[in-house]
């Protein structure tokens, strides 16, 4: 399984638009083949920062997600509305145990 974490810190004047675009992106992404989960959360320590957590069945599914034009458009839109650079980190994960 591939785990993706990401974040964006919106400008104060663009937070509502960043939140709207992020929710649309998450909902669309959940319908893609290989998407196990996809969520966005508001950071409790910085209310302008959104944090993304995604799980993908495998790297091929994630690469297909990155190739979707709407995904590329989403990233470009966020970058234009962000206070600082967006972050994306990928992890290759194996579930050890569900507690």
Q: Where are the predicted features?
A:
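Short, well-ordered beta-strand segments in beta-rich or mixed alpha/beta enzyme
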Residues: 2-9, 39-66
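Glycine-rich beta-strand-turn "strand-cap" elements at beta-sheet edges
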Residues: 2, 40-48, 74-99
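An amphipathic, aromatic/His-enriched active-site/gating alpha helix that lines ligand/cofactor pockets
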Residues: 20, 24, 28-36, 55-89
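N-terminal first-folded block
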Residues: 2-36, 40
């Amino acid at each position: 399984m591939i785990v993706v974490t990401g974040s964006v810190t919106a400008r104060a004047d663009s937070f509502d638009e960043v939140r709207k675009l992020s929710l649309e992106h998450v909902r669309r992404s959940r319908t893609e083949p290989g998407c196990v989960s996809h969520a966005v959360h508001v950071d409790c320590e910085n209310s302008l920062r959104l944090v993304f957590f995604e799980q993908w069945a495998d790297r091929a599914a994630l690469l297909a997600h990155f190739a979707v034009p709407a995904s590329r458009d989403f990233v470009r839109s966020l970058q234009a509305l962000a206070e600082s650079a967006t972050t994306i980190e990928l992890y290759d994960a194996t579930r050890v145990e569900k507690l």
